[in-house]
Amino acid sequence: MVIFFESIKINKVSIETEIIDSFSEKGVQLASGKLIEADIIVTATGIKLQNFGGIRIFVDDHEVDVSKSFIYKSMMYTQIPNFINTFGYINASWTLKADLTSKYACRLINFMKDNNYAKCLPEAPEGLEETKGFLDDFSSGYVRRAASITVRQGNKKPWVNNQNYLKDIFEINYGKIEDNSLRFS
């Protein structure tokens, strides 16, 4: 294992995240056109992402197509009431976002209990535009292949998947629970 890391340190090894177009006697031809000459090739393909581990979600006997939903505060989905999903940061510790999400969930549950609400549903405003996919900041091939099945994000708060802990602290920990985007009943 030490030899591998030493080889990386002195630039004898390269790691590429790219679609393989073909193999040849010289190495690997990537879809981008780049040829990587190689003695050994280790592929890391085959992972297929699923929403919620493959669990199908139904609301009022209709299956929800998550790819048609918008994300709210990086944790709730339009079309799915009373549902919070934890999705961490790609550029920092995963648990930082998980902690914020858990705290928000507790605040939301307490707010609903205090106000005798049984249901909470994020509703995207008319004209909300999708700016990029929820996972566009990930470069891994298996993540990019799943882009068509994942939730969408909008062009303004709270419909953006922030990858910034400091922004999220204020928006999630200290922002109002009751806003123009959540519908309670």
Regions found by a protein language model. Give the residues of each.
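Flavin (primarily FAD) cofactor-binding/catalytic cores of flavoenzymes
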Residues: 1-111, 178-185
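C-terminal, flexible cofactor-proximal segment of oxidoreductases
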Residues: 71, 82-185
